Every structure is written in structure tokens, then in C-alpha cells.
């Protein structure tokens, strides 16, 4: 079994440090996803349907969302950011259209 590596953006790391309780829950969720992608079914994860990016997902825990990308050929989960529901989608538009 191949384990995925997890890489957090600076914004995601900052969120986890600043919001310990919910940050730990996201951290544990990503650890479980990295161990086995089949664990994705135990979480509220949905895929974004974008022509530009086919491998971007969101993970919901409570009122917060994490936007992440699974890069299978590198065995990498890249977490863009974690924020409240309203803020994360505004940020997502900026990321997708800047690149």
C-alpha cells in the first residue's frame, strides 16, 4: 500500500495553529485520507467539477471547509486552505483564476 504525503499551504498551517480544536480534526482527517483513499467515504468530501482542475476536493467539518488537491502520480495531498464556508469559496475563485 502506498501512503500519500500531505503538504499544507502556509494559509492552511496558519489556520490549524490558530484554531486548535477544529484544526486537529482536519489534521486527523487528512492523515486518514493519506493512509488510505478509501477513507474518503467516511468524511463529507465532494469533488469540484472544473474543466481546469479535475482533482480538487473540499472536506467539510462543521462550518469549515478545506480545499485540497489529490495528485495521484506524486502520491500527494495538497491542502490549499481551511476557512469558514463563506470565505473558502471566495478564496477558491481567486486560486483557480490566478493560475
Residue ranges: model-predicted function:
Residues 14, 46-47, 62-64:
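Amphipathic, hydrophobic secondary-structure cores in small proteins
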Residues 1, 35, 40-43, 83, ...:
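Residue-level signal for pocket-adjacent positions within structured domains
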Residues 1-31:
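Arg/Lys-rich, positively charged N-terminal/basic patches that mediate binding to nucleic acids
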Residues 61-64, 69-99:
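Enriched for short, Lys/Arg-rich terminal
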Residues 32-58:
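A short, surface-exposed loop/turn module that caps and links secondary-structure elements
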Residues 2-4, 41, 55, 75-78:
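Residue-level signal for beta-strand positions within conserved beta-sheet cores that form or flank
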Amino acid at each position: 500500500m502506498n501512503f500519500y504525503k500531505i503538504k499544507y499551504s502556509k494559509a492552511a498551517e496558519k489556520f490549524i495553529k490558530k484554531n486548535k480544536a477544529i484544526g486537529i480534526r482536519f489534521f486527523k482527517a487528512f492523515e486518514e485520507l493519506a493512509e488510505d483513499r478509501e477513507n474518503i467515504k467516511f468524511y463529507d468530501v465532494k469533488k469540484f467539477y472544473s474543466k481546469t482542475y479535475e482533482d480538487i476536493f473540499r472536506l467539510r467539518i462543521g462550518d469549515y471547509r478545506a480545499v485540497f488537491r489529490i495528485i495521484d502520480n506524486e502520491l500527494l495531498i495538497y491542502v490549499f486552505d481551511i476557512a469558514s464556508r463563506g470565505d473558502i469559496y471566495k478564496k477558491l475563485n481567486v486560486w483557480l483564476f490566478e493560475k
